[in-house]
């Protein structure tokens, strides 16, 4: 796609509305492709997509791998547990190894913030054409998850042609472990750029006041302010909400002192059918997964297809990641379809 200028996708902080629209439009096209009997297209035939996952992942890794294969790319899967990292090899040396194997796109996930950016800088320093896509770095960002969330929400409102304008003015509540969530950070950037009113809700220990500073960064391309509010009680955040996104409690990243107990968290911030009654009647529920049933939300809500968008999120993830791989991969001449 000749209009796409971004080489790497590392953060949504500087994404413009025009770029979001291009992702939505491209993803909608691939979503249609995935409905066909033959779900493969030759768009990235001859390209090599390497998933460098230094952190465990099921959904994201599988989704990117399937997306690459649907685009006819060759894939290489790196697993940190069986790699030379245990023998002292550095992360950048690992990236250079896969560069030497012919990688065109590197999809990078790491428990430390900034690793995808460091690999992207190294690829540029070496004068390569390699593209880097951030699949989640520490508590920093998770761009592809936020973009599939955006696509899912827009698809509910405008099924025929999802567009950014669909959610302008909509109230979207994000509830849960916001402090440790890279998903929350990327969603704040994307949803506020779309003109949605974003309401964050969590106990004070999981939602520092500093999150209000996101609103101080104007939307790229328009310069408009971002609409963001913080709530330390759930009901005010849910009142008249059109969409509610609940986040997993990341116990592996938090100290035990942040919460009295999981039972106490569910009592105050867990989503139940009764609590959703203050939302819009048409409210929809999202969760990036994996879900702690009975903690972040009740099992009956998760399985209620009239409310839950959790399975559509997973389905849409493949189309959105196809779009991202295509957009950055199409800048490589061999990737452009005839």
UniProtKB/Swiss-Prot annotation:
UniProt GO MF annotations: amino acid binding; aspartate carbamoyltransferase activity
Residues that hold carbamoyl phosphate according to the record: 59-60, 109, 142, 145, 289-290
Swiss-Prot/TrEMBL keywords: Pyrimidine biosynthesis, Transferase
Catalytic class of the enzyme: transferase
Keyword Transferase applies: yes
Family annotation (Gene3D superfamilies): Aspartate/ornithine carbamoyltransferase
GO biological process: 'de novo' pyrimidine nucleobase biosynthetic process; 'de novo' UMP biosynthetic process; amino acid metabolic process
Binding, L-aspartate: 87, 182, 248
GO cellular component: cytosol
Catalysis performed (reactions): carbamoyl phosphate + L-aspartate = N-carbamoyl-L-aspartate + phosphate + H(+)
Pathway in which the depicted protein is active: Pyrimidine metabolism; UMP biosynthesis via de novo pathway; (S)-dihydroorotate from bicarbonate: step 2/3
InterPro entries according to UniProt: Asp/Orn_carbamoyltranf_P-bd, Asp/Orn_carbamoylTrfase, Asp/Orn_carbamoylTrfase_sf, Asp_carbamoyltransf, Asp_carbamoyltransf_Asp/Orn-bd
EC id: 2.1.3.2
Record's keyword annotation contains Transferase: yes
HAMAP family: Asp_carb_tr
Family classification: Belongs to the aspartate/ornithine carbamoyltransferase superfamily. ATCase family.
Subunit text: Heterododecamer (2C3:3R2) of six catalytic PyrB chains organized as two trimers (C3), and six regulatory PyrI chains organized as three dimers (R2).
Function of the molecule: Catalyzes the condensation of carbamoyl phosphate and aspartate to form carbamoyl aspartate and inorganic phosphate, the committed step in the de novo pyrimidine nucleotide biosynthesis pathway.
Name the UniProt record assigns to this protein: Aspartate carbamoyltransferase catalytic subunit
Organism of this sequence: Synechococcus elongatus (strain ATCC 33912 / PCC 7942 / FACHB-805) (Anacystis nidulans R2)
GN (gene name): pyrB
